[in-house]
Every structure is written in C-alpha cells, then in structure tokens.
Amino acid sequence: MPVHNEILLVDEVCQSVEKAVRKMPELRVTIVDDGSNDGTGKSFQKNLKKVKNTKVILLGTNGGKGRAVREGFRDATEEKLIFMDGDMAYSMDHLEPMKVSLTKYDVVIGSRSMVPQAQGGLPARRAFLGWGFNRLACSLLGIDFPDTQAGLKGFTQKAAKALFAKQRLNDFAFDVELLYLCRKLGLSVGQIPAQVTSIHTYKTSQVKLIFDSLKCFQEILLIRWWSWTGAYRLGK
C-alpha cells in the first residue's frame, strides 16, 4: 500500500488494516511511505507496531507510486500480490473478490466504470480529463480498458515478477504502463468493480491536474518510444 503525506488518514487506514488482518489471517500488509514530510511513515510504524502480519517501509525520498509499489513487492513471496492506494480510495472489502479473481487471471484490476455512480461527486473537469486520458492511452498503446487508473490492482506472483522486471515509470502513467506490458507479455487481465469510498477526497488542484495530464501524455509517448526501441524486449 503506497502512501505519501497522508497523516490525517493514518488512524483510519490502520483500523481498516487491523480489521482486515483479523478477518483474513493469511493476509500480509506492507505500507510503503514514499518520502512523506508530514510524519506519515513514523505514524504508521507506531500505530501498526503491535498488529500482526504488517510491515512499514520508509523510503527516504519521494520517488513516485511506481517505485513505492515495486519496493513493496520486492521481497514478497505470497502467491497473490495486491496493491491499493493508501488514501482510502478503496476499502479492504475489495481484497476478497480480488483474491478470487486471481485464481482465474494473471492480473486483476479494479474498475470504477463497473460501479454505477462510482464517480459521484467527482469534479467535472477531473472526470473529463480522466476519461480523455484513458481513451488516449488505450488508443495510442493498443489496449482496451474502461478504467486504467484505479489504484487497485492484483497479480499472481509469476505475473508480478514478469511485469515489474520490465516496468520503468514511477508515477503518472505507471498504471497504464503495467497494462501495456500485460498485453505485450500475453497476460490475462480480469476486472472487478471498484467502489470509491465515501470518505475519499481528491486533493489535486486544478492547475496541478492539468499539468499532471500533460505529464501523463508525455509518459504515454515515452512508453511507445521504449517499445519501439526494444527497451521492453522479452528476455532483455
């Protein structure tokens, strides 16, 4: 679970994690603090100190969601690996259907488009830019998913090793790159409904939202370039 500057949500997340671990004794939860400067990482360490099957990794600098996810999966030995955003966008209730779906697919992604009104309350500009980015990414990269950006994705151990050995981006288009690599590696991809929690808030300003959208477009082109130059070549 990658987190960055989420000090106000630490208690809520820890309660959800503790409840999930009690419900699923086989569950192992790793919180990866991506260089927070508000004490998020230390607070997670304190709150989860006595909670079984949990671990907190502190990254000294902010390197992006992609790096945080890779670090969280680096030493994982479980047969099914799942990452979900640490800002409480999605509840732990998604873990069970994700786990079940991973018995049928190599990769399973959460899709907000499968939940009626899942984007309720989402600012119009954000919704429009998100839809536009998704369609642009799918068109340029030859993939077809109604929701590439939901921070809820699961992998079999074998699929995760194959994907993260090739994956390069650290943020912005990180999720799109993963799905592009799924197609390139011939991995099967399933989808489950991803319901956004009622307490989740979108913190990005309008200016940063537009800048991030432009950065995402740049990274989509970078994915195309890497593919064309053989950077993703199998066995490389």
What are these language model-derived features?
Residues I143-D144, R168-N170, L179-T197:
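Catalytic donor-sugar/metal-binding loop of nucleotide-sugar-dependent glycosyltransferases
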Residues L59-D75, K80, M92-F172, I199-Q218, ...:
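Acceptor/aglycone-binding surface of glycosyltransferases and processive sugar-polymer synthases
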Residues E6-A20:
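Short, well-formed alpha-helical segments that are part of the catalytic scaffolds
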Residues E6-L9, S36, K65, S91:
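Donor nucleotide-sugar binding loop of glycosyltransferases
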Residues L8-E12, D38-N47:
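Acidic helix N-cap motif at the loop->helix transition within catalytic regions
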Residues D33-K42, M88:
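A conserved acidic beta->alpha catalytic loop
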Residues L27-I31, G41-D75:
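Conserved donor nucleotide-binding strand/loop of the catalytic core
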